[in-house]
Amino acid sequence: MSRLITLQDWAKEEFGDLAPSERVLKKYAQGKMMAPPAIKVGRYWMIDRNSRFVGTLAEPQLPINANPKLQRIIADGC
């Protein structure tokens, strides 16, 4: 049995009937809101069977005069 499963299957196990939509799950994956985080395999997001949802742990604090390129990178979540 594989350790990685799709986000939708993981959400059914983690949240039950109240699982978020596929779009929201992808946002969670891009924001690394699971521990261990989801990874993109080809066109699909996959996640470890034992991962847990942790949400946003901390927001980076940027100075007001930060470089616009830095602000854009942080805003995109990359």
Curated annotation (Swiss-Prot):
Keywords: DNA recombination, DNA-binding, Viral genome excision. It comes from the Viruses. The keyword DNA-binding applies. One of its GO terms (molecular function) is DNA binding. Gene3D superfamilies: 1.10.1660.20. InterPro entries: DNA-bd_dom_put_sf, Excisionase-like, Excisionase-like_sf. It holds the Pfam family Exc. Disulfide bonds: none annotated. The keyword Oxidoreductase does not apply. Excisionase and integrase are necessary for the excision of prophage from the host genome by site-specific recombination at the att site. This is Excisionase. It comes from Enterobacteria phage P21 (Bacteriophage 21). The lineage of its organism: Viruses, Duplodnaviria, Heunggongvirae, Uroviricota, Caudoviricetes.
